Amino acid sequence: MSSLYYANALFSKYPTATSVFPSGVFSEQTSCAFASSPQRSGYGNSPGGTFPAGSAAHGLFSNGSSLHPQSPAMYPSSYGLDAASFNMHCSPFEQNLSSLMCDPTKQNCTKAEQRDSELHNEANLRIYPWMRSAGSDRKRGRQTYTRYQTLELEKEFHFNRYLTRRRRIEIAHTLCLTERQIKIWFQNRRMKWKKENKASSPSSNSQEKPETEEEEEEEE
């Protein structure tokens, strides 16, 4: 008697049993590992490698009892677990994992964009002196000169009542003043000097004409 005949006679004694686990407890796609590889290593496609799962499981336990009780729920209701709890797929897990993980490169990009936008806004809000309005409604305060500045300007006026542009720049740098302030001071000082000499000298009218011409040349 061959071994194949003996095996067939042995397994024919037991009826075909159902699956070890009751139907409906586990879905077909329980996890990523079971979904990706339906066959396990060690079980080939040859006739000698196949093994009937139902009959073997039925033979392992006496009285045809299954591994788990034949109840519709695997765990009691107090655990709060049902058949839908085991139906896990790969795509929701990967989506949740990718949403929880933060990308440092994206954060650096957003910070760089915010910094560029702030610099751009500061550049737009920057106001230069030539952009300010020079209307008549602006009230300018009276310029006050220190004693040292007044003394140096008086000494310069004593030698030269009219200044060249180069000399005006030199005095402005020396006294920490602007060219406009030097020019205004000399204009006011010349007007004062004219008033002082008008009453003392009768020939003041003849001196006013060349002075006005020089003032026009200086303003240009």
UniProtKB/Swiss-Prot annotation:
InterPro entries noted in UniProt: Antp_homeobox, HD, HD_metazoa, Homeobox_antennapedia, Homeobox_Antennapedia_CS, Homeobox_CS, Homeodomain-like_sf
Annotated protein name in UniProt: Homeobox protein Hox-B7-B
Record's subcellular location: Nucleus
GO molecular function, one term: RNA polymerase II transcription regulatory region sequence-specific DNA binding
Compositional bias (Acidic residues): 211-220
Pfam families linked to this entry: Homeodomain (PF00046)
DNA-binding region(s) in UniProt: 138-197
GO CC terms: nucleus
A biological process term (GO) from this entry: anterior/posterior pattern specification
PROSITE patterns: ANTENNAPEDIA, HOMEOBOX_1, HOMEOBOX_2
Motif Antp-type hexapeptide: chain residues: 127-132
Region (Disordered) residue spans: 195-220
UniProt-listed SMART domains: HOX
Keywords assigned: Developmental protein, DNA-binding, Homeobox, Nucleus, Transcription, Transcription regulation
Highest taxon in the source lineage: Eukaryota
Family named by the database record: Belongs to the Antp homeobox family.
Protein task: Sequence-specific transcription factor which is part of a developmental regulatory system that provides cells with specific positional identities on the anterior-posterior axis.
